[in-house]
Amino acid sequence: MRQILAFALIAASARAQAPDAAVSTAAAAESVALPGGPPVDMDYLAYDSESGRLFIPAGNTGKVDVLDTKTGKLGSVDGWPTAKTADRVVGPSSCSVGRGYAYVGNRADSSICAVEVKSLTRRGCVTLPSVPDGVFYVAPTKEVWVTTPREKSLQLLSVKDPAAPKLVATLTLDGGPEGYAVDEQRALVFTNLRDKDKTLVLDAKARKVIRSFELGCGPTGPRGIAFDLEGRHLFVACAAGGVKVLDPVGRIVGRMETGPGVDNIDWLQSRHLLYAASGADGTLTVAEAAADGSVKSVSTVKTTPGGRTVIVDSAGTAYIPDSKEGRLLVIKISR
């Protein structure tokens, strides 16, 4: 399917930066219109660095759109179940990539299905006991973990056969899990308890919580998480605004200032850049994190109200879902 692009040049806002910030002069933005909208209900996206493909679960359309970030071509995996709720149509809503497969969570039938990245062919599926929220691949154990906040639990799927996910365990938590990150070197998993204002650290191999950190995000709690593999810093977004930087023992050693309404964030390890989108004021904030956990603003770019999640490709290009308008904002930061 051919993509429709609307080009605009968005000036970076220098006023929002600290005086010593390395502010970009401009950011080029493209708007990729998605089929079946508007609206197109989007939440968790997934990027495969090997193929350069961006997987975009598009809930109400019954599609998982796939953007080739190298060529700009848009394709899709079709035929996903949808279901009507009181206020919207739900369907595929989350995705993660590992070992040549994308694993797609569907809120319509509580399933997780494997999609072969190369052929975009759907393979095996498994049904969960609760509606999936976030889906993430845990490389050290060859598993896919799924946050199921309604049951205050994590569902663990074995993908030793990557085409055939299999439910193998349930981890019950003290609250509803929200967001995720993985330390592949140390086999650690991180997730937040949104209703408890905490971040949990889990031993992926032992399948248990080994520590928890108090965050102080406030009544709306924490949302997205990212992890710096080199510095071992954990970045935790607060829904009320801002991203806190935690060291390995949970001390807050830095803070990235953002507008309110932040959800999923992302981290570009190769450039030590942290990305956070604020849905309340429609901005993307990019900051550079130092070895000590301190952060320095690089750019603040105007996006769109409601754009509260961001994912980044290997080149540093940011992708922000705009569900209301049925499009994906593509923002290239000039430095």
Which residue ranges define each predicted feature?
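Positively charged n-region of N-terminal signal peptides that target proteins for export
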Residues: 1-4
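Hydrophobic h-region of N-terminal signal peptides that target proteins for export
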Residues: 8-16
